[in-house]
């Protein structure tokens, strides 16, 4: 049995120390931007920042939710920064990004949940870097009328919203969210703008059963989600939800095989898979898989 107090070898990553890593870090700091890489203590930060890829977190650094898996601060949110979209667009230019991922904290305090701020960020990047493809990873916009339409009209290349875990664990792991609201959000984005690729992810190792994971796959395909990511849950601090299991690389391969039979355009399932990890390369693969499927129809 795996010792849950010690990370297995397949989870361990090298400490970041490259010149490019520190260049990315300095640029983010100088432009006063937040990143989910830092705030969520992502294990892949060294690899991504060394390749000058960072997932920018907009709408402040304080979340209005308190999910049991997440390391982002929770409490009274920051004031909305009207200059953030411009600074984000500047970062995209300076990092020479071909593909950018934008995420955010939950903003239940805002009338549209921050949807219009996402749209402004997309528009600013389109103006200054028209060839850069844009992926957004949004909150669920629970009870935020009109938010879905704002996002769909902004037309990101990829819309990502993570279901995070199986529905039976929502009350303990993601208490402020509703599983079927997340599915509805993904479904409605695709319905309003079919050309947008949709993506969702979940963590394993929280105590879920394999049949529950498979049911989530089916639910996501029912919502016409194109791309599924599955990764190992890692406990940020001792005050967060405990790890119930370290899922082995072989078990991840098994989950990937099952998911591929469901009809997703693309599946990424490894211990270190995260929503935006290798998102640039994955977007190219996603487009390629779509074109192959289109040609075979």
Curated annotation (Swiss-Prot):
Residues 49-265 form the Radical SAM core domain. SUPFAM superfamilies: Radical SAM enzymes. It catalyses: [[Fe-S] cluster scaffold protein carrying a second [4Fe-4S](2+) cluster] + N(6)-octanoyl-L-lysyl-[protein] + 2 oxidized [2Fe-2S]-[ferredoxin] + 2 S-adenosyl-L-methionine + 4 H(+) = [[Fe-S] cluster scaffold protein] + N(6)-[(R)-dihydrolipoyl]-L-lysyl-[protein] + 4 Fe(3+) + 2 hydrogen sulfide + 2 5'-deoxyadenosine + 2 L-methionine + 2 reduced [2Fe-2S]-[ferredoxin]. [4Fe-4S] cluster 1 binds at residues 37, 42, 48, 276. It holds the Pfam family Radical_SAM. It is found in: Cytoplasm. GO terms for molecular function: 4 iron, 4 sulfur cluster binding; lipoate synthase activity; metal ion binding. Binds 2 [4Fe-4S] clusters per subunit. One cluster is coordinated with 3 cysteines and an exchangeable S-adenosyl-L-methionine. It comes from the Bacteria. Belongs to the radical SAM superfamily. Lipoyl synthase family. This is Lipoyl synthase. It comes from Rickettsia prowazekii (strain Madrid E). The gene is lipA.
């Amino acid at each position: 049995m795996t010792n849950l107090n010690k990370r297995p070898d397949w989870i361990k990553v090298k400490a970041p120390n490259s010149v490019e890593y520190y260049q990315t870090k300095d640029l983010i700091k100088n432009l006063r931007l937040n990143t989910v890489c830092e705030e969520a203590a992502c294990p892949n930060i060294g690899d991504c920042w060394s390749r000058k890829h960072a997932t920018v977190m907009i709408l402040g650094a304080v979340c209005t939710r308190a999910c049991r898996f997440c390391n982002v601060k929770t409490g009274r949110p920051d004031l909305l920064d009207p200059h953030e979209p411009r600074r984000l667009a500047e970062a995209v230019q300076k990092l020479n990004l071909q593909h950018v991922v934008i995420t955010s904290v939950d903003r239940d305090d805002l009338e549209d949940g921050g949807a219009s701020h996402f749209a402004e960020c997309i528009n600013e990047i389109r103006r200054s870097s028209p060839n850069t493809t844009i992926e957004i990873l949004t909150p669920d916009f629970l009870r935020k009328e009109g938010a879905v339409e704002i996002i769909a009209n902004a037309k990101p290349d990829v819309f990502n919203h993570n279901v995070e875990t199986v529905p039976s664990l929502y009350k303990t792991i993601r208490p402020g969210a509703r599983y079927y609201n997340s599915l509805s959000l993904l479904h409605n984005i695709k319905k309003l703008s079919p050309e947008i690729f949709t993506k969702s992810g979940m963590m394993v190792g929280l105590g879920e059963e394999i049949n529950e994971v498979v049911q989530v796959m089916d639910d996501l395909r029912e919502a016409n989600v194109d791309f599924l990511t599955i990764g190992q849950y890692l406990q940020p601090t001792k005050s967060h939800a405990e790890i119930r299991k370290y899922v082995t690389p072989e078990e991840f391969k098994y989950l990937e095989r099952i998911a591929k039979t469901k009809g997703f355009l693309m599946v990424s399932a490894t211990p270190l898979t995260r929503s935006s990890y290798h998102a640039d390369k994955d977007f190219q693969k996603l487009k390629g898989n779509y074109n192959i499927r289109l040609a075979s129809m």
